[in-house]
Amino acid sequence: VMHTSLGECIRNNKMLPSFRARFCTRQIKIEPARKRMAALAAQGEVNHYVGLRADEETRLGGIFDDIGIVNRHPFREWGWGVNEVWQCLQRHGLAERIPERTDCDVCYHQQIGEWWRLWTNHLDRWMRGENLEIEVGGTFRTPGRDTWPTSMRELREAFESGRIPKSERQPELFSRGTMTGGACRVCSL
């Protein structure tokens, strides 16, 4: 089953994605990509360029050889790690525009600072996530991951009461100077 939106995917599965149920990645990213690449492969050879770095040896990234797709890993071929990739992005004026991660805006992998920036900069998206939690029953955030509330409603209430994540009060301690510099990853796409 392929879906066009996270909300549709969640409603169809009648549950929120979590580290134990990563159906969203498969149904929103992998299956549509496989379908498109299979159609391309039917027309001839397809090279699939994957942005995994040389310092990410254990990650495979998109294995499509069963449908005739050739995976290419240029960063690995060049021996580039995270520093070389960011240096290249800086040389081309792109470093400030690239988010640290490109997951969904209500992904269970988010860190508390990312939740804060979503609430601060994109309240409409926040509320869409909060409503999905209520509709399906459950939370996007993993219980016990940190000392913050788990549900988006309770987390919003904590933010509204003035509680601010340490990463947002002292960004110089938590950002990679070369990354998004504390900018909202949704805004920087």
Label every PLM stretch briefly:
Residues V1-L189:
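Nucleotide-activated chemistry modules centered on ATP-dependent adenylation/adenylyltransferase
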